Structures are given as structure tokens and as C-alpha cells.
Design a protein with these regions (language model features):
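The conserved cystathionine-beta-synthase
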Residues: 1-10, 17-18
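N-terminal nucleotide-binding beta1-loop-alpha1 segment
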Residues: 28-67
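A conserved hydrophobic position in a structured secondary element of the catalytic/binding core
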Residues: 27, 96, 143, 210-211
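A short, conserved acidic/glycine-rich loop-to-beta-strand motif
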Residues: 163-173
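Catalytic-core segments of class I nucleotidyltransferases/pyrophosphorylases
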Residues: 140-141, 148, 154-161, 174-177, ...
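Conserved N-terminal catalytic core of the sugar/cofactor nucleotidyltransferase
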Residues: 11, 40, 72-145, 150, ...
Length: 245
């Protein structure tokens, strides 16, 4: 709970007191590992322009980045996580209900660390990145506005650089058990196969990436495109795209 409070309030330590309010110790943010994490100074780009239709009816009132998780909107939780690792420059690509997003963050302590890029039309999960051409000249984190990845971002950067990746896709391992027997039907209605409660494991795309700035130069302006299509384009050019599981 102390760690969560420090992240939300952007403070580095909290005193631990007993019932008589005598200090018994100090709890440091990230257990004192902040000094090392501050070395991670990369821009963060957040795709925050979608309508959030899968979250209806909530997103009919609030834009998806402002959907609350506890006391804070999810976008602020995401930003706080990056701040934990020393990131201090945030680029938000906005469209739907963008004035609400800007108004909210204007009242926060991190207002001066955020730059907005306004889409004039929906450009998909990748097209909006064309607005950042010439603005970013180093590797950057790219994240959806509805996913909190609890990983070591410094380790992701180390993996990205050691493998000379153009794009690193952060994936999550998922394991599912279908709670029913699954039947495969053959020709004529015969049973070709029958498996009781089969289990499947696979890697899923979290919507969290580490991207080299050269990728921005290949994105056409004012063209709607998904970031997975951008990934495929880079792979087609022989660029290295790797998975961080």
C-alpha cells in the first residue's frame, strides 16, 4: 500500500511509525531502487485517441484514458509507472473527447511533462504516429492507454538494445482451459476428434512496444493504419522485430 501511495503522489519515501507516532523506519519507492531507474530517460508515446467502444457505456461519458481504476484514471496509472523508471516526457496522441483528457491532466503535477498531438480524423493504432515525425530522435516506448504492464522497463530496454531490435513487442503468456468437451466434426457429421476440456497456451500482444525512431519516417501521413501493419512492414524490409515475453 505504501508503494502504491508513493507512486500516486510522486513522492520518494514514507516514514513508518508505530501507534505512538514514533518513526520506526522508512519505506522507499521501489525499495530504494529509484536511483538506478532514473537512468532510463526515454520518451513515452501513448495512443489515447480511440473511442473505447468495447467499454461502452462508460466511454460514452468518459474517454477511455480517463476510465478510473481506483482513485486515478488508467492513463495516469500508466504514466506513473513510467515515472517510476525515470521517464519524464510523455506524448499523447488524442482525438475522441480530447478536451476532457487535456483538462484533466492540466490540473495534475505532470501537466508540464505532457505534449499532445491532435488527430483530425481517426488514424488507427499506428497512423497517429506520423504526427511525431521529427519530434522524437531516440528509442521510445509506445503504449495503449488501457494496459498497465508490470514488468522491468529497464530490462526491456536492455533486451531491445542487446538484440539490435527495430521494434520490441512486449507479450504476455496466457493459458486457457476450455470448460467443455470440444468436438471436431468430420465429413457426413461423423466425429473426427473429441477432447475433454482442452488447454491452450500462447503469447498475446499487450499493446506495449519499444520502437526505434526510424520507424516514424516510414509511416504515411493522414493514412489510417494499425500498428501491427507497421510491424509487418518493418519485417518486410528485413528489420528485426522481436518479442519480449
Amino acid at each position: 500500500q505504501a508503494q502504491q501511495t508513493m507512486r500516486e503522489k510522486h513522492i520518494l519515501s514514507i516514514p513508518i511509525v508505530d501507534h505512538e507516532r514514533v518513526i520506526k523506519g522508512i519505506c522507499f519507492l521501489n525499495n530504494g531502487a529509484l536511483e538506478e531507474r532514473q537512468k532510463l530517460k526515454l520518451p513515452v508515446v501513448m495512443m489515447a485517441g480511440g473511442k473505447g467502444t468495447r467499454l461502452y457505456p462508460y466511454t460514452k461519458v468518459l474517454p477511455k484514458p480517463l476510465i478510473p481504476i481506483g482513485d486515478l484514471p488508467i492513463a495516469e496509472h500508466i504514466i506513473n509507472r513510467f515515472i517510476d523508471f525515470g521517464c519524464d516526457a510523455f506524448h499523447l496522441i488524442v482525438n475522441h473527447k480530447k478536451q476532457m483528457i487535456k483538462a484533466y491532466f492540466a490540473e495534475t503535477e505532470i501537466a508540464g511533462q505532457i505534449t499532445y498531438y491532435d488527430e483530425t480524423e481517426p488514424l488507427g493504432t499506428g497512423g497517429g504516429l506520423s504526427l511525431l515525425k521529427g519530434k522524437i530522435h531516440q528509442p521510445f516506448f509506445l503504449t495503449n492507454c488501457d494496459i498497465i504492464v508490470k514488468a522491468d522497463y529497464s530490462d526491456i530496454l536492455d533486451f531491445h538494445q542487446k538484440n539490435d531490435n527495430t521494434i520490441t513487442i512486449v507479450c504476455a503468456y496466457k493459458h486457457f482451459t476450455i470448460p467443455y468437451g470440444v468436438i471436431t466434426m468430420g465429413e457426413g457429421g461423423d466425429i473426427a476428434d473429441m477432447i475433454e476440456k482442452p488447454e491452450y497456451s500462447f503469447l498475446t500482444n499487450t499493446g506495449f512496444y519499444l520502437v526505434e525512431p526510424e520507424v516514424l519516417d516510414d509511416i504515411e501521413e493522414h493514412v489510417s493504419i494499425g500498428f501491427p501493419d507497421i510491424v509487418e512492414k518493418q519485417r518486410g524490409k528485413g528489420k528485426k522485430v522481436a518479442i519480449y515475453p
